[in-house]
Structure formats: C-alpha cells, structure tokens
Amino acid sequence: MSDSARIVAIDHVQLAMPEGGENAARAFYAGVLGLTEMPKPAELAGRGGAWFAAGRVQVHLGVEADFRPARKAHPALQVEGLAALVARCEAAGVTVARDVPLPGMDRVHIADPFGNRIELVERVSTRSGRDAG
C-alpha cells in the first residue's frame, strides 16, 4: 500500500444482548468483572444496551431483537489477578471453564448473563523468568 492509512487499535468490542437486559449487564460487567459503566452518546441512548470500560478497553452491549448469544466468537479480556477474578466470578455464581494454558498465558472462559462467551487471560512469566508479553 502506498497511502498512510492503517489500523492502530481496537476501539471497542460489541456484544449483543436481549431487550431489557441492562440491569443484568450492569450487575455482571460492573459488579462482577469490575468494569465501569460509561454513558452512551445521546444519539444512541434510545436503542438500549449499556457500555462499559476499564482503562482503554471498552465493551458495548447492544440490544438485538432476534438475540442469540455468541458462543464461539468472543472477546479475550487481559486481566491482572486472574485467580482473584475467578474467585469473584465463582462467588457470583458464574461458571468458570478453565482452559489449557498457552505459553506465557493462563486463561479461563466464562459467559455473561446472556450466554455470550468471554475469555479472561493473564500473562504469566515463562520458565526463563522473562515476561511472556
């Protein structure tokens, strides 16, 4: 390519939710995962749903009339303190599926209240003592 256009980051991830699920979304994304709800722009507020953020990570939940949860496609949220977050999820009744660790990474899968799959990953030191990130 000869122009200077390039993708530099993911701005947000959008997941679908059923109509009327905003309170369940708040309880899970803010209450369990610890994200902060952010106000939706006035132009989009009437559509329902809710937006959440932690640092530069944004997760948007949008209402979908013919809702079906994403069970394969999923965001992977990088965390610090995976064991503590897993304990918080389990205490809240969220099923945690541990997955095969990858080199330099521990990971688990959970589902939001609507059945959308979410992967939680934490970078861990490799055997050589260097950070895997």
Briefly describe each language-model feature range:
Residues 37-39, 61, 95-98:
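A short linear hydrophobic-aromatic micro-motif
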Residues 1-26, 73-75, 128-133:
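N-terminal beta-strand motif that seeds the catalytic metal site of vicinal oxygen chelate
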Residues 1-8, 10-19, 50-53, 64-89, 92-133, ...:
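Vicinal oxygen chelate
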Residues 42-45, 66-69, 100-103:
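A short beta-turn/loop motif at secondary-structure boundaries
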Residues 15-57:
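Core segments of cupin and vicinal oxygen chelate
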